[in-house]
Amino acid sequence: MAKSLLFGEQARRSMEAGVDKLADTVRVTLGPKGRNVVLDKKFGSPLITNDGVTIAREIELEDPYENMGAQLVKEVATKTNDVAGDGTTTATLLAQAIIREGLKNVTAGANPIQIRTGIRKAVEKAVEEIKVISKPVNGKEDIARVAAISAASEEVGKLIADAMERVGNDGVITVEESKSMGTDLEVVEGMQFDRGYVSAYMVTDTEKMEAVLDDVYILITDKKISNIQEILPILEQIVQQGKKLLIISEDIEGEALSTLVLNKLRGTFTCVGVKAPGFGDRRKEMLQDIAILTGGEVISEELGRDLKDVTIDMLGTADSVKVTKENTTIVNGKGDKVAIKERVSQIRVQIEDTTSEFDKEKLQERLAKLAGGVAVIRVGAATETELKEEKLRIEDALAATKAAVEEGIVPGGGTAYIDIIPKIADLTSDIIDVKLGIDIIRKALEEPVRQIANNAGVEGSVIIEKVKASEAGVGYDALNDKYVDMLKTGIVDPTKVTRSALQNAASIASTFLTTEAAVADIPEKENTPPMAPGMGMDGMY
């Protein structure tokens, strides 16, 4: 395919036009008085949102060079979202400011490579200073503040703080759509996995169609059980003790299943069978997790253990087990606390080492089941459009909260960026163009406060000067139109979000400035096929 080429200033300006189109669409959403953007959907109702990355992902421009610029800034938003989960609008805004100031200097004859060196130097110093002013998150109140600022709702803040308090920092919190109008929280205590009973005849409560077993033994195996003789020795020992049994296996079928059901119906003893969770190697690991949590052993031929040789001390135990058609929940497993801690540490190491997002998510789920629990925030609203918007807000708030717990918090509303400007201004260089790069970052750091003020209907430059003249930590509360101590008032941003937004924006923007040529495909013209003979108008009468 033939290519179209642009060089130098023309290439950079065409790409900058695309950057501006995307950034100007996103920037209107920043701050407590930021607006929403409506996104057209081919199927279903339009999506109304103020989430920067969701908006950026929808934007594709017709002009190929403008689209290149837009896609580069889209990467800033996406990367920030992947790393920190929030701050995508801020990152987009910073990238636009760095590109705008940088191109002015490049046009005036400055060397883009030296400018990039200056930008990197300034960003390193800025990140250092952001970490210096960062404060750790202390307790439920701080968590609620971070979530409330991100979601622009105190109610959501309290909900997320409750969820994190109940499942711990290692717990998994998911956001789902609710069928009711309100937004509520549901917490699953203990270990839950998505496998139900193998036969409905095993239920103990026929009204609710669930089996609840108290003070229960748990047999864990990766084998398929079809012959009752294999598990008869251990069943006899359990019957003698008058206890109940949960069997977790690959499957229970044939003679084994019918015998267990028959004994349950006769009232001889209560046994519930469920299939093992997961597949392949993940199944082996999950069975091992259950074994450690309950203090049992996995009966597997790989480990040289046979079902016929199982003794009572090889079984796991728990205070209670609840089995429904779809889920099994083990509450208060009696496993050794030290062994559980070691297993948790092992999974944490695997999470750090893995590069796959899918594997990371699955490991995080396993960690939560062992260390914390699982909380579900169910989001409800009057219409589907409102529901989607609310769900996105809560997901952002959740990500911001986790980022805050990880690295701490800084004064919000762009105040942290203003507070570190004097430290950036102190940086020097003998090379003029490097100094220009430092100045570009110094100016760009003002941009979030300016935009928050503009969205609130006040003059951004005036607000910036007042914040600069105030003590460190004092910023502009756009919601109430006054200057306050941001940390004390609870207007805070996660350190990780503030840091990531600047690093990602500077990374893409500084590379953008070094562009000297742009290459794009020339769209092919569609050839209209010739008309078939006899299809013309001649000869009609």
UniProtKB/Swiss-Prot annotation:
Disulfide bonds: none annotated. GO terms for biological process: protein refolding. Its EC number is 5.6.1.7. One of its GO terms (molecular function) is isomerase activity. ATP binds at T29, L30, G31, P32, D86, G87, T88, T89, T90, G413, D477, A478, L479, D493. It catalyses: ATP + H2O + a folded polypeptide = ADP + phosphate + an unfolded polypeptide. The keyword ATP-binding applies. One of its GO terms (cellular component) is cytoplasm. InterPro entries: Chaperonin_Cpn60_CS, Cpn60/GroEL, Cpn60/GroEL/TCP-1, GroEL-like_apical_dom_sf, GROEL-like_equatorial_sf, TCP-1-like_intermed_sf. Its main location: cytoplasm. It is found in: Cytoplasm. PROSITE patterns: CHAPERONINS_CPN60. Belongs to the chaperonin (HSP60) family. Forms a cylinder of 14 subunits composed of two heptameric rings stacked back-to-back. Interacts with the co-chaperonin GroES. This is Chaperonin GroEL.
